[in-house]
């Protein structure tokens, strides 16, 4: 495999500008936007994000990542509704009695490129907070501290710590994560 030096960054990471400008999306979303723009198609759309399955016997999760999705969509001409961060949601595709975690309404071409990063922001954070909440339940009243950032990419450390904090952890080990959580 050929070695490639990065010219504009130190690490193989998307920066905030890359994410906000939709450079982290899949190419078919870019192609879709180009077709919609070229043909001046202004179709109104509603995107609903559900959790239909969780890899645990219990069908609940803890929603996180909403703050980041709100920041991603900030300034776009769309209407957004979301459950509050930290809420416990049910992920049971066998029943009609569950609601979307996130709803976006607007012209599809205004938010099509953000679908991929939105789902990534939600699923990465929510998977950590859901797992962390299960540790919180298992620990009961015992003190629970997060030391998980030594096993994730350093860029994700604040996300992991925030997700653990929202899930009920008593303390955080990562310096930057703890500082950002407050």
Regions found by a protein language model. Give the residues of each.
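Ordered alpha/beta subdomains of enzyme catalytic regions
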Residues: 1-180
């Amino acid at each position: 495999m050929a070695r490639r030096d990065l010219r504009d960054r130190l690490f193989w990471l998307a920066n905030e500008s890359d994410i906000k400008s939709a450079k982290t999306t899949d190419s078919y979303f870019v192609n879709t936007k180009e077709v919609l723009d070229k043909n001046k198609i202004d179709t109104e759309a509603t995107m609903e994000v559900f959790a239909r399955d969780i890899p645990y016997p219990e069908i609940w999760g803890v929603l996180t990542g909403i703050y980041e999705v709100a920041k991603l969509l900030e300034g776009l001409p769309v209407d957004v509704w979301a459950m509050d961060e930290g809420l416990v949601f049910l992920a049971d595709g066998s029943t009609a009695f569950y609601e979307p975690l996130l709803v976006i309404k607007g012209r599809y071409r205004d938010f099509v490129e953000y679908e991929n990063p939105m789902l990534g922001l939600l699923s990465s954070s929510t998977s950590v907070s859901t797992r962390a909440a299960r540790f919180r339940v298992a620990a009961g009243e015992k003190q629970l501290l997060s030391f998980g950032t030594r096993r994730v990419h350093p860029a994700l450390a604040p996300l992991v710590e925030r997700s653990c904090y929202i899930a009920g952890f008593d303390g955080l080990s990562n310096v930057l994560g703890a500082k950002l959580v407050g």
